[in-house]
Amino acid sequence: MNVVTQVRLDLLAEMEERYEKKDTQYFVKLLEHDDYVIRCRTTCILVDIGGEDKVEHIAKVLKNDTNELVRHEAAFSLGQMCYSSCILPLEDATKNDSSMFVRHEAAIALGVVGSKSAKETLEEALNDPDEPVRDSAVVALSNLEFMEKLSKNEKFAKLTGG
C-alpha cells in the first residue's frame, strides 16, 4: 500500500517553491486542504515564516481541525511561537479538546510559552482524566516555576518546557 501519492508529492514540491517566496496567503489557504499531511506541514511552515500575525490562523487550526494530529501540531507550533497571544487558544485546548493527545501538547506548550497567567489552567489539568495530560501539566508547571525563580537563559528555559 502506497500512502505517499504523486499528487501529495507534487503539492509538496509546489509548497517548497512558495515557501522560498514566503507566500503567507498561499499557506493560509492550505490550512483548509483536504489532506491532513498537507495541513500538518502547512502549520509548521507558517510558524517558520514567522510573525505574530500567524497566531490567529494556527489557533483556528487548533480549535477547528477535524484531525487530532493536525491539532496537536498546532498546539506544538503555538508553543514554539511563544507569543502571549498564543496563551488563550492553548488554555482552551488544554481544558476542552476532546483528544488527550492535543490536551497533553497544549499543556506542554503553555509551559514553553512561560506565562504565569497559564498557571491556573495547568493546575486544573492536574485533575484531567488522562495521565499523560496530568504529567504534561507537571512538566509545564515545573518549567513555569523554574523560569520564574531560577532561569538565567530564556532559550534554555524554553527548551526545557517539554
Write out the residue ranges for each language-model feature.
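Alpha-helix N-cap/helix-start positions at coil->helix boundaries
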Residues: 5, 21, 36-37, 52, ...
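Conserved hydrophobic register position within alpha-solenoid helical repeats
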Residues: 8-11, 42, 74, 106, ...
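Core register positions within helices of long alpha-helical scaffolds
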Residues: 14-18, 45, 77, 109, ...
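Solenoidal tandem-repeat scaffolds enriched in leucines and small polar residues
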Residues: 129-135, 139, 154
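TPR/Sel1-like alpha-solenoid repeat signature
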Residues: 46, 61, 74, 78, ...
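N-terminal "cap/leader" segments of large eukaryotic alpha-helical scaffolds
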Residues: 1-29
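Amphipathic alpha-helical scaffolding segments comprising HEAT/armadillo-like alpha-solenoid repeats
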Residues: 18-32, 51-63, 83-95, 115-127, ...
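Short, contiguous, helix-prone interaction/anchoring segments in small proteins
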Residues: 33-49
